Amino acid sequence: MGSAALEILGLVLCLVGWVGLILACGLPMWQVTAFLDHNIVTAQTTWKGLWMSCVVQSTGHMQCKVYESVLALSAEVQAARALTVGAVLLALVALFVTLTGAQCTTCVAPGPVKARVALTGGALYAVCGLLALVPLCWFANIVVREFYDPTVPVSQKYELGAALYIGWAASALLMCGGGLVCCGAWVCTGRPEFSFPVKYSAPRRPTANGDYDKKNYV
């Protein structure tokens, strides 16, 4: 596969991952009510996200409420907000950088400089994926720990929501796509090729009697 095709494929994966990360950030499904034993007949389900919480009735009616106070939020929610939004914005910067250095655009003249710009964009996408993984894994760890904590009431136990799985898939796409962009750009960075020096021997000189000197023969 050519370097340009690698860059395009990587950019497509990064764009899909970016959209998935935006969905994960906005969906109020980072944790959902855990249905355990005696509360399985409950008439409502609670969803909680980074920006709002929703209550879904058994009739299908859903009511959501946006978090009004930032200071009243837990530390993990505040950190997840900051890191996820930061990853989304960094991915936007990576998009412009990658498009500037991509072989399919003419923003920069073809050459090593253009390839290094694309390489930087791919690296930024990979960093976005890693940055998004931090709040996702941190939040999931808290949900799992509280689920198995016997001191937490059953009514307050939650399970992993769909937004976490979407976020993990988006992070994987961002890192894989960033890696493909870097691979495609690395081919065009103008790095020196490995070669072996070629030695040339001087032509043999004839002697006075017209014969070649014996020392010229090996």
UniProtKB/Swiss-Prot annotation:
Residues 1-7, 103-123, 182-218 are cytoplasmic. InterPro entries: Claudin, Claudin5, Claudin_CS, PMP22/EMP/MP20/Claudin. GO terms for molecular function: identical protein binding; structural molecule activity. One of its GO terms (cellular component) is apicolateral plasma membrane. GO terms for biological process: calcium-independent cell-cell adhesion via plasma membrane cell-adhesion molecules; cell-cell adhesion; establishment of blood-retinal barrier; maintenance of blood-brain barrier; myelination; negative regulation of angiogenesis; negative regulation of cell migration; negative regulation of gene expression. It comes from the Eukaryota. The chain crosses the membrane at residues 8-28, 82-102, 124-144, 161-181. Residues 217-218 are annotated as: Interactions with TJP1, TJP2 and TJP3. It is found in: Cell junction, Tight junction; Cell membrane. Pfam families: PMP22_Claudin. Residues 29-81, 145-160 are extracellular. Keywords: Cell junction, Cell membrane, Membrane, Tight junction, Transmembrane, Transmembrane helix. Widely expressed with highest levels in the lung. It is a multi-pass membrane protein. Interacts with MPDZ. Directly interacts with TJP1/ZO-1, TJP2/ZO-2 and TJP3/ZO-3. Plays a major role in tight junction-specific obliteration of the intercellular space, through calcium-independent cell-adhesion activity. Belongs to the claudin family. This is Claudin-5. It comes from Mus musculus. The gene is Cldn5.
